[in-house]
């Protein structure tokens, strides 16, 4: 069985890889060691943070609407900020707390479907995620010592840790307070089959009947469950996914006409109209704003 065999009845289908193939995340280690006193991390558009509190305790403050929410951390904890959120650490002034930290740059920024589904912050005791400790041990070993390739390897290990966290989120959407969206849809075994089919073949025409058949549900039951989980209709979701993949291909340097054909649009003008309706600009204008050409 292949990793993306969406027709299989096995519950162990890989729900993340097709998404991460199109929307990669790049982690960059920027701190390993003690943090003392009051530390501020300003919101940076399109950028998230992943912090691992290894030892010590501290107060976490983060922007929650118009106010600063406050949480006391007293055990080894992982902190995931998937989007630009101002946050602060208040540590003991001398001994501090021991941290390993990375920035996260998600392809697509705020339109990344993973980012769109997650809350502003996820706070997890390290022991909550089965199998995480092995990756953390490797991460700490590389971040604690300056050896050839250590920084590059630490960056990749942070990405491994993030994927393990995303796995946990899919399996525990209520605990993670996941909003309606792709991640909550993937947490439902039946809906996941339809979503994976859409993710694996964005060029196909995904009708309600076809998606419901993949999920093994009636059209009415599927449409209702899909709307509740993702906050979108099946038709709107499949088009949005197609256009998200289009931006990924455009960023990779594919010509507009080629993107249109690869994703099943009748022609480049049809693709451009759909792109403009969703993004407010044409693909060429979007590329121009990024300093690129079509």
List the predicted regions and their residue ranges.
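A short, N-terminal "cap"/entry segment at the start of jelly-roll beta-barrel domains
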Residues: 1-29, 37-42, 120-123, 127, ...
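N-terminal intrinsically disordered/low-complexity leader segments
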Residues: 1-12, 174-182, 291-294
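N-terminal regulatory/effector-sensing and dimerization cores
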Residues: 27-121
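Short helix-to-turn junction characteristic of helix-turn-helix DNA-binding domains
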Residues: 53, 198-201, 246-253
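Aromatic/histidine-rich interaction motifs
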Residues: 111-137
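An amphipathic alpha-helical interaction segment
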Residues: 127-196
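Basic/polar phosphate-binding segments, predominantly the helix-turn-helix DNA-binding elements
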Residues: 164, 170, 183, 193-241, ...
């Amino acid at each position: 069985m292949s990793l993306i065999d969406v027709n299989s009845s096995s519950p162990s289908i890989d729900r993340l890889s097709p998404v991460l193939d199109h929307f990669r995340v790049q982690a960059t280690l920027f701190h390993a060691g003690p943090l003392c006193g009051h530390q501020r991390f300003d919101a940076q558009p399109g950028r998230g943070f992943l912090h691992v509190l290894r030892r010590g305790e501290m107060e976490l403050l983060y922007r929650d609407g118009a106010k600063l929410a406050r949480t006391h951390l007293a055990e080894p904890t992982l902190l995931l900020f998937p989007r630009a959120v101002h946050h602060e650490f208040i540590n003991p002034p001398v001994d501090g707390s021991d941290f390993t930290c990375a920035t996260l740059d998600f392809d697509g920024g705020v339109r990344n479907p993973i980012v769109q589904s997650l809350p502003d912050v996820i706070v997890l005791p390290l022991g909550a995620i089965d199998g995480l400790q092995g990756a953390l041990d490797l991460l700490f070993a590389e971040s604690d010592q300056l050896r050839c390739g250590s920084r590059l390897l630490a960056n990749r290990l942070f990405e491994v840790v993030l994927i393990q966290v995303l796995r946990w989120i899919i399996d525990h959407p209520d605990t993670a307070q996941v909003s309606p969206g792709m991640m909550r849809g993937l947490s439902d075994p039946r809906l996941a089959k339809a979503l994976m089919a859409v993710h694996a073949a964005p060029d196909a025409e995904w009708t309600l009947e076809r998606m419901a058949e993949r999920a093994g549900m009636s059209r009415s039951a599927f449409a209702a469950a899909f709307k509740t989980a993702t906050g979108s209709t099946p038709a709107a979701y499949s088009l949005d996914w197609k256009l998200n993949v289009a931006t990924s291909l455009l960023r990779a340097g594919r010509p507009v006409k080629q993107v249109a054909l690869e994703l099943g649009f009748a022609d480049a003008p049809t693709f451009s109209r759909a792109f403009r309706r969703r993004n407010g600009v044409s693909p060429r204008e979007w590329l121009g704003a990024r300093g690129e050409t079509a």
